[in-house]
């Protein structure tokens, strides 16, 4: 018996998406971003499936170490860098590249005695104003890294977009120009484009692209779909109907009796709720896919269940699949109904949801 709820992960879709991104950025290497448990798709699942990626981007040291312990030998890049001497020593020991974005990290490098030089990506704050050295700091920081014997040469260079998922926002072009002006004539590898940069700003693709959400078949742009770019959804979130009930006009359903039927109908109870990571704030009308059609959520999402209006003539049965998002019902569409982004939906599934790679 298959577990439910479950997130079915398509290796075919993952491989398609990597190949498609290579077509979109033919002159760039691909740093596949697999942080946050592979965007909810399973860290090792994704890394082994995409073992032909040129490297993997992680947020935290434990994620990178999990890949090394899982047999992944590819290039790994720690996007938030290290925050202790122990972390730095461990990264070097396991051949993990590190981003350097603040003075504390720089001083740790300068004061360390390492078994071999660390491979560094110097992060420039070109407009995101979250991590990185400012343009005014850049030259001095670069010179200190150049002079540091604990840093492998050449130094690699990186920045991150603030608004690339808004294709008409002029600030992205400003960031591209600022980054290119600062690093002009310097050696080392360059990386600027995230998923949105890769898809919408080809001039940002540089030596390495860093796709995250696009690898999983999802568009980073609200109102867009991954399928519009030849991407395939890699996750299908599936549960089952555990009850089908006749429901009379005027009767409520669920906590708070927030929804009343306007006419006689049949309701289906789906075995998934906020305890599984499905958002409690999903409003009435959010679609679920049952037997080839969209049916709306009615009433409140509870911890283990939600209810859908199947319609008076429904022939659905207990045990039938209910798809919360996937090929037929894009996660981007569900996110828009809920008032969130697809990133949040796929990364917030709890351990109660079985993640199954085909």
Curated annotation (Swiss-Prot):
Q: Please name the GO terms that the record assigns under molecular function.
A: alanine racemase activity; pyridoxal phosphate binding
The answer to keyword Nucleotide-binding applying to this record is no
Q: Which UniProt keywords apply?
A: Isomerase, Pyridoxal phosphate
Query: Which GO cellular component term is one of those annotated?
Result: cytosol
* GO BP terms: D-alanine biosynthetic process
Q: Please name the InterPro entries in this protein's record.
A: Ala_racemase (IPR000821), Ala_racemase/Decarboxylase_C (IPR009006), Ala_racemase_C (IPR011079), Ala_racemase_N (IPR001608), Ala_racemase_pyridoxalP-BS (IPR020622), PLP-binding_barrel (IPR029066)
Q: What catalytic reaction does the record list?
A: L-alanine = D-alanine
Pathway assignment reads: Amino-acid biosynthesis; D-alanine biosynthesis; D-alanine from L-alanine: step 1/1
- Which Pfam families does the record associate with it? Ala_racemase_C, Ala_racemase_N
Cofactor(s) demanded: pyridoxal 5'-phosphate
| PTM sites of type N6-(pyridoxal phosphate)lysine | 35
Residues that, per the record, bind substrate: 130, 303
Q: Which SMART domains match?
A: Ala_racemase_C
Q: Which PANTHER family did the record assign?
A: ALANINE RACEMASE (PTHR30511), ALANINE RACEMASE, BIOSYNTHETIC (PTHR30511:SF4)
HAMAP family listed in its UniProt record: Ala_racemase
Q: What does this protein do?
A: Catalyzes the interconversion of L-alanine and D-alanine. May also act on other amino acids.
- In its UniProt entry, what is this protein called? Alanine racemase
């Amino acid at each position: 018996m298959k577990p439910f709820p479950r997130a079915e992960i398509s290796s075919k879709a993952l491989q398609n998406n990597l190949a498609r991104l290579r077509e979109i950025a033919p002159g760039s290497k691909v740093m596949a971003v697999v942080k946050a448990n592979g965007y909810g798709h399973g860290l090792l699942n994704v890394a082994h499936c995409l073992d032909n990626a040129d490297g993997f981007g992680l947020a935290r040291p434990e994620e990178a170490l999990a890949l090394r312990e899982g047999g992944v030998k590819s290039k790994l890049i720690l996007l938030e860098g290290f925050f202790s001497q122990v972390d730095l020593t461990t990264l070097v020991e396991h051949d993990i590249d590190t981003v350097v974005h603040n003075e504390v990290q720089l001083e740790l490098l300068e004061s360390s005695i390492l078994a071999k030089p660390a491979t560094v990506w110097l992060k420039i704050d070109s407009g995101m104003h979250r991590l990185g050295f400012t343009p005014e700091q850049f030259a001095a920081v670069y010179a200190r890294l150049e002079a540091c014997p604990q840093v492998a040469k050449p130094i690699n260079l990186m920045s991150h977009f603030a608004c690339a998922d808004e294709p008409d926002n002029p600030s992205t072009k400003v960031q591209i120009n600022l980054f290119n002006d600062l690093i002009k004539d310097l050696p080392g590898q360059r990386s600027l484009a995230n998923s949105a940069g890769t898809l919408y700003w080809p001039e940002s693709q540089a030596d390495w692209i860093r796709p995250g959400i696009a690898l999983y078949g999802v568009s980073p742009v609200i109102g867009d779909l991954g399928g519009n770019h030849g991407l395939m959804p890699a996750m299908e979130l599936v549960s089952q109907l555990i009850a089908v009930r006749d429901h009379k006009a005027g009767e409520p359903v669920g906590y708070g009796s927030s929804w009343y039927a306007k006419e006689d109908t049949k309701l289906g109870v789906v075995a998934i709720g906020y305890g599984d990571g499905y958002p409690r704030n999903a409003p009435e009308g959010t679609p679920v896919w049952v037997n080839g059609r969209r049916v709306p959520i009615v009433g409140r999402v509870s911890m283990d269940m939600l209810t859908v209006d199947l319609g008076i003539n429904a022939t659905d049965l207990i045990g039938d699949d209910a798809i919360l998002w996937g090929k037929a019902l894009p996660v981007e569409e569900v996110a828009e109904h809920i008032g969130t982004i697809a990133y949040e939906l796929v990364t917030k599934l709890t351990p109660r949801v079985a993640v199954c790679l085909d």
